[in-house]
Amino acid sequence: IAALAGAWDMFGTQLTAAMTIEKLDDHLWSMEYKGDYGFDGFLEQGGAKSDAEMGDYIASFLSHGFWKPDTSAAGGNYGCSTVAVTSPDGAALFGRNFDWEECDKMLVHTVPKNGYESIATCNLDFLGFGEDWKPDGSMGDKFMALASVYAILDGMNEKGLCVADLMVSHEEGVDQNTDKPDITIVSGLRLLL
């Protein structure tokens, strides 16, 4: 019983989040993550200079160092756009397109211990778990899908702040050397939300 209690203490938040994954439509899932998803720890350890470094942190945090999934970088040509408008009744509306022919998407609802509640989207293909991977198979597949909390492409928080990564294929990168934690585009979006 002590071992089970220890395992729950270590993985309870992640297991609870994994159990919320629901298929909404072809290529569309949703999940809710309540609690600490490790973002403060990510910043405290210096952030990450690359998607690969960020992936290493995510795998280590979610698995507590017990395993690391095989991943490969997603690529391709793309260009995204967003729209923000006010409806006739005064409501603020925010939307985006996913400029991929076909991709698996996750609606990610987060309620962090230290931050604002938000809803965001993730292109699951960008997690790099392979073309045949889906988040609704085994518990292991669902657990891997928790990485979508970090790989968001847009979102809105409870205060109304909307952010988006408008992707355009390019080769040049930006490298700034400061005393602040390193962040990638997607970790910057998570930080803002």
Protein language model regions, located:
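N-terminal mature-domain region immediately after signal-peptide cleavage
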Residues: 3-193
